[in-house]
């Protein structure tokens, strides 16, 4: 009888530990760290996109506007580049959202067919902050997914 109680308690404890492991929240992974010019695959509405980010620099008009060149290549489906998920970040962690205008040389926010690509610039308003040194792709929940730096 004592053996049965011990076996039952052990079974319940093992089941509890297993359930805790299954139900535990997934740990957040560190974002993928890349050099400017390298490519990262990111899931997007309608498919997946390989993003290549390069040339983070001031616009040259002494107005505090910075930009980065971005190429988006559709890897699967018929995805739409999500320009709103790009941010510039400074070494002091200041983060600058992209400027959501319709710049003539901006990255198009339109679906792209699988195997094709589109390129353009993503602009950031850094007028009152520290100069950025990286471009960050964040998902809709605000989690950093990819960071491009020098």
Model-derived features: where do they sit?
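Short glycine/proline-enriched turns and hinge-like loops at secondary-structure junctions
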Residues: 62-65, 80-82
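The feature marks short-to-medium sequence segments in extracytoplasmic or secretory-pathway proteins
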Residues: 73-118, 147-149
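Hydrophobic residues positioned within well-ordered beta-strands of beta-sheet architectures
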Residues: 51, 68, 120-122
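Membrane engagement elements in two modes
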Residues: 2-54, 59-62, 116, 129-130, ...
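Histidine- and aromatic-rich ligand-binding microenvironments
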Residues: 16-17, 107-110, 114, 120-121, ...
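Short beta-strand/loop motifs in extracellular/secreted proteins, especially
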Residues: 49, 82-84, 133
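Short, well-ordered beta-strand segments enriched in hydrophobic/aromatic residues
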Residues: 64-76
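Short, surface-exposed ligand- or partner-binding patches at beta-edge/loop junctions that are enriched
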Residues: 121-146
């Amino acid at each position: 009888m004592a053996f049965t109680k011990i076996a039952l308690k052990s079974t319940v404890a093992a089941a509890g530990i297993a359930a805790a492991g299954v139900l535990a929240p997934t740990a957040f992974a560190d974002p993928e760290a890349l050099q400017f010019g390298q490519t990262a695959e990111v899931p997007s509405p309608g498919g997946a996109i390989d993003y290549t980010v390069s040339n983070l620099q001031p616009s040259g008009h002494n107005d505090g506007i910075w930009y980065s060149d971005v190429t988006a290549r559709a890897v699967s489906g018929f995805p739409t580049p999500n320009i709103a998920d790009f941010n510039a970040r400074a070494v002091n962690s200041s983060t600058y959202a992209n400027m959501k205008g319709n710049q003539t040389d901006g990255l198009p926010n339109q679906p792209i067919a699988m195997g094709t690509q589109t390129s353009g610039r993503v602009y950031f308003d850094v007028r009152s902050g520290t100069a950025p040194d990286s471009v960050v792709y964040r998902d809709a929940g605000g989690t950093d997914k990819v960071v491009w730096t020098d």
